[in-house]
Amino acid sequence: AMINYTFEPNEHTQFNLATSFRFGKNGYSALTWYDGADPRPDYYRYMPSYKLLNATDLEAASMAAASLADQWMRNVGNIRHFDWDEMYQTNMNFRNAEDEAIYGPGARSNYIIEERHTDQLDWNLAAQISRIYKDNSRLTAGANVRINRTWYYDEVKDLLGGDYYVDVDKFAQRDFGDPIMAQNDMDYYNQYGHARAVREGDKFSYNYKAHLRSSGVWATYATRFGGFGMKLGAELGGLSMWREGLWRKGLFPDNSKGRDRKSTRLNSS
């Protein structure tokens, strides 16, 4: 939404004021997985060239690579596409006593559709005043303010046949093998002793806000002397930014939650 206002107290002076406010949800979906085979058909381990990597029997590997390349060319068994049926079956049938002891009865999804959000609130205000003098010189001055908050988080969009998904950092778990470092929400883990089970519509993986504040003032003066013109201008502004973490992450337990130190910059010209 935008509002503009113009006021002319006399024929030599004009005042303009404009403000705008923008908000909404913005996200895009993607496939993600945990504790399951990579479902991407073009994953490098599924490519014909991978058959030749570190092969001890080059002749046999070459034949296997050629056969796989032929399947790709002819799209045998829809090899070039995601196998959604396989993912649904895996999710619906993934049950074990350890999970049920923690989360209760239900099938744990290995594959889900996530929606990565960048939801914004953005407010802008700009004011300008212009004055024309008797010698036709003009003085124009203005000020502007902007306040922006962008909320970054991941959301479960579709469990693909399962009942819940376990919210852990699969890359931290793979690289460090430490259940503490793999937690996306340490406060929850410390309270309950296990990672959260998330369902459709729940936030998971990451959750933080980025804040921005900016303001500035400026002025210009223009005049003419015979056939010559002169214009002078000056501007002064400031910008501050900071991150606000909403969860304490296992990889960075001491500085991931709460407000970071502000980064501030002054500009002048």
Where are these regions (language model features)?
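Outer-membrane beta-barrel domain signature, strongest for Gram-negative TonB-dependent receptors
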Residues: A1-N148
